[in-house]
Amino acid sequence: MSEKRVQPLARDAMAYVLAGGRGSRLKELTDRRAKPAVYFGGKARIIDFALSNALNSGIRRIGVATQYKAHSLIRHLQRGWDFFRPERNESFDILPASQRVSETQWYEGTADAVYQNIDIIEPYAPEYMVILAGDHIYKMDYEYMLQQHVDSGADVTIGCLEVPRMEATGFGVMHVNEKDEIIDFIEKPADPPGIPGNEGFALASMGIYVFHTKFLMEALRRDAADPTSSRDFGKDIIPYIVEHGKAVAHRFADSCVRSDFEHEPYWRDVGTIDAYWQANIDLTDVVPDLDIYDKSWPIWTYAEITPPAKFVHDDEDRRGSAVSSVVSGDCIISGAALNRSLLFTGVRANSYSRLENAVVLPSVKIGRHAQLSNVVIDHGVVIPEGLIVGEDPELDAKRFRRTESGICLITQSMIDKLDL
C-alpha cells in the first residue's frame, strides 16, 4: 500500500463507486461483463482507476454498487481489493442490487443505488460521501475536491471538465458564476453555456459528487418519497440542489494527478469501441498522454502470478518481435510481428502472424499467418490460421462489429460463424 500521508478530510470520507452499468455502446464487449469490469491498459480493469484514486487520495472506506452481469466484476474486486482491515477503520463493501427496500425493486437509478444501502453506510458514520462513476479513465486526488467542498460551504461539489463548448453537448453542463457556484445544470444542451471569462469552453460533469453525509441521506430519502423521480443524481438530486441549495463546481485541472510526462489533464470516457481502442492504443506511444508507470500514483489491480513474456524465432520471415507495443506477462510471441499493439496477459501469437494497431484481451490465441489491424479482440478468442482483418472494409463489416472509423471488434461467437 502507498505510503502517501492520509489527509484528515479523506480519513473522514467514504467513496461510493457506481459500477452497475452495462455500457451498451461497447456492444458485444459488455455482453458478459459490466462496463467497469472491462479490461484496460494491459493489466487493469476500468474500475481500478476510480478505486485507485480513492485509495491514493487517502480514503479508506469504499463501497461499490454492482448490478448488470456483475460476476466478473465481483470476482475481480474480491481478488484484488481484499486488503482493507476493519481494525484500521478500513472497509471495502461490494453492494450488488438485492432488493433491500422492496421485493420488486432493483437499483432504479444512480441515486437509488446509494439510497438502498443507507443502512450499510450510516453505521460507518463518514463525515463526507464521495460519489464516483466506476467507468472512466483518469487520475485524481479527491482530497483537493473535499477541501474545496468544506471551504465553500457547498451542499454538493461537482467534479467538472473544461471542454470546448461544442464538444459539451453530450454531457451534463454546469452554468456557473465567477465563483464557480452553479446557477443551472443542463443535461446535454444544444447550446452549452460558456465559462465566465473563458466563453469558448464549458464545464461538463464528470459524474463525481462530494456531499456531507447527513445532507446526502436527507436528499436521498426526500427523493425516494417523490413518485415522479427517476432516482438519478444527474436528473433529480443535482437539479434539486442547484435550485434549492448551494452547488459548486470543482475543476478537474485543480486535482488531476500528473507525472512529469503528463502535460494536460487526462480524462477519458471509454464508452464506445472507438474510444476504448484509442485509449488503449495511446498507451503504446513513446510518451503517452496517460502515465500508467507513475509510481507515486499507482493503479492498483488484481494481478495473477504469471511467467514473463517471451519472444522466440529469428528467421527473416518468422521473427518474434514487437515495435511500439505493450506486451503483458505470460504472452508468447512465437515468430509473430507486432506493431503499435497492446496485449493483455496470456496471449499466444503464432508464426507468420502480423498484428498492427491491435488491442488483444487476455488468453487470445492468434493462428499462423493471421493478418490483423485496427482490431479489438475479446477475451479468450481463438483466431483461425490465415484470417485477414483490416484490409477489406466490406467483408469486415459482414463478419465482425466494424465501426465507422474502421475499428473491428472480434468475439468468439463471431469467429464461430465464419465460413472458412
Swiss-Prot record:
According to the UniProt entry, what is the EC number of this protein? 2.7.7.27
Q: Give the enzyme class.
A: transferase
Q: Which reaction does it catalyse?
A: alpha-D-glucose 1-phosphate + ATP + H(+) = ADP-alpha-D-glucose + diphosphate
What is its pathway? Glycan biosynthesis; glycogen biosynthesis
Pfam families, sorted: Hexapep_GlmU (PF24894), NTP_transferase (PF00483)
Where exactly are the transmembrane stretches of this chain? none
- Report the domain of life of the source organism: Bacteria
Q: Please give the InterPro entries that the UniProt record associates with this protein.
A: ADP-Glc_PPase (IPR011831), ADP_Glu_pyroP_CS (IPR005836), GlgC_bac (IPR023049), GlmU/GlgC-like_hexapep (IPR056818), NTP_transferase_dom (IPR005835), Nucleotide-diphossugar_trans (IPR029044), Trimer_LpxA-like_sf (IPR011004)
The entry marks the following residues as binding alpha-D-glucose 1-phosphate, namely Y107, G172, E187, K188, S205
Q: Name one GO molecular function term.
A: ATP binding
Cross-referenced NCBIfam families: glgC, PRK00725.1, PRK00844.1
Self-association or partners: how does it assemble?
A: Homotetramer.
The entry sums up its family as follows: Belongs to the bacterial/plant glucose-1-phosphate adenylyltransferase family.
The protein depicted here goes by the name Glucose-1-phosphate adenylyltransferase
Organism name: Agrobacterium fabrum (strain C58 / ATCC 33970)
Its gene is glgC
